Regions:
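Alpha-helical residues within the helix-turn-helix
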Residues: 60, 71, 77-78
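N-terminal leader segment of winged-helix/HTH proteins
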Residues: 1-33, 79
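Histidine-centered divalent metal-coordination motifs
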Residues: 38, 71-72
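Short, hydrophobic-biased segments on the C-terminal half of alpha helices
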Residues: 42, 73-74
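Residue-level signal for well-ordered alpha-helical positions
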Residues: 45, 106-107
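N-terminal helix-turn-helix DNA-binding core of bacterial DNA-binding proteins
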Residues: 24-65, 91-98
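Short, charged/polar, Gly/Pro-enriched secondary-structure boundary elements
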Residues: 99-103
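Beta-hairpin "wing" of winged helix-turn-helix
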Residues: 78-87, 94
Length: 112
């Protein structure tokens, strides 16, 4: 009598998987991005095409108080997503292209 073949119920997993460090980095970034105001700020900056945007423009566009906008900008800056530039008494922000590339590089394999 011939032995029966073993049939696997699962498709073997293939490809590169997130390391613990990459997963922790994504978790940190998603926590920062998990706020609608920060997502709106990031959207404004991405639409600015690399140009710096003054903090006062966020206040006008978002309808938030200056301290609240500053808090959200600090969260995004501390996460490494934005860079800050001081011009006189005003602060200007822009997206760090390297940070967006890194985020895309981490998310793309997960998204497929």
């Amino acid at each position: 009598m011939k032995p029966l073949p073993v049939i696997s119920c699962c498709t073997p997993l293939a490809g590169a998987f997130l390391s613990d460090g990459e997963a922790a980095e994504l978790e940190r970034l998603f926590r920062v991005l998990g706020d609608r105001h920060r997502l709106k700020i990031l959207n404004i900056l991405l639409r600015a095409g690399g140009d710096a945007v003054c903090v006062c423009e966020f206040i006008d566009h978002l309808g938030l108080a200056q301290p609240t906008v500053s808090y959200h900008l600090k969260q995004l800056t501390d996460a490494g997503l934005l860079e800050r530039e001081k011009r006189g008494t005003f602060a200007y922000f822009r997206v760090r292209p390297a940070a967006m590339e890194r985020l895309h590089g981490l998310v793309e394999p997960v998204a497929g």
